[in-house]
């Protein structure tokens, strides 16, 4: 036996480098093959394959952690109800006369854009909506809290950041009061966004009786492979009838009248009408994914009644975008279509301007066609590295005739 053991040890010492090399080679081939077959962006595929082969073993590990989108396969099982909502919204679709009056004749550029976006998103255009812009937390938070206080059936709230500060606590109190009234309440916070406050407000919500969940908390080991897949959606839907969405997180810094330590300028929207059903459906899918609970029943039915009758309503369509989309390039197609349809002007406002080549080229082509293209960026940014990267890209649009404007402080997250 000692002789056999010694022989096995000697055999292993002799062969382990070859076995390890073969294993790394197989993993490298598998990872690079996956990247080539799955990645739809050619540059992304080339970059991942380069990393995988130039850093054997380590590159494949990094690709497995950050390069594989696991959300799509899980979320695809939760989309059946989205088709049902789209069917229900067909009754709220504008007729031909309404489209002619608002968007133009069938040959008009905006009509072709409407058709394009419908085909890309597979979500119908809804009529008879009311959309009200709300500037910052000073305008938006009181209206949102009033909507929560008036809820009679359900409240769905999703936010990337939900700080444990005076504003956050005010929302907790309003949500807790709704629970005590018998309202169905669900709150979804991103796993990384929740960590902006320490300790997280999650425990305070749960102590107040509010059903809350984190979207892919990175503190849980099994969710580590999802670390780069975040939920930045900001959604509030009350009774399936009144919705809010935009750029506002829930944090005291968005209340500029309070002179916060880290002020943030932002814009939010109050939405009434059939399109609110699309907002609610996105939340229901996100909640089912994160909390493993399917929200159903009368409390979670969308109210498809018109918010505005006649010709004063707004045509609207909710376009979802995120790592759970089966076609991650759909937003690029929508933007490219919009820029191609532009006749007079294009106004772009974003806190983080990092467009890919396709969007840059579409902006440049629009400017060279004589369209006025204005890009508004924050004068100061909360992410220094992103600001540097954004500034380094501006020459690509400036030299083709686009105009770039910088807003004064505070940081503009609009």
Question: Can you name each region flagged by the protein language model?
Answer:
Residues 1-333, 337, 341, 365, ...:
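N-terminal localization/anchoring segments of enzymes in phospholipid and broader phosphate metabolism
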Residues 342, 352-374, 378, 383:
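Helical hairpin unit composed of two closely spaced alpha helices linked by a short loop
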Residues 313, 343-345, 372, 399-401, ...:
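Active-site lining segments that contact anionic ligands and/or coordinate catalytic metals
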Residues 137, 323-333, 354-358, 385-386, ...:
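A general structural motif
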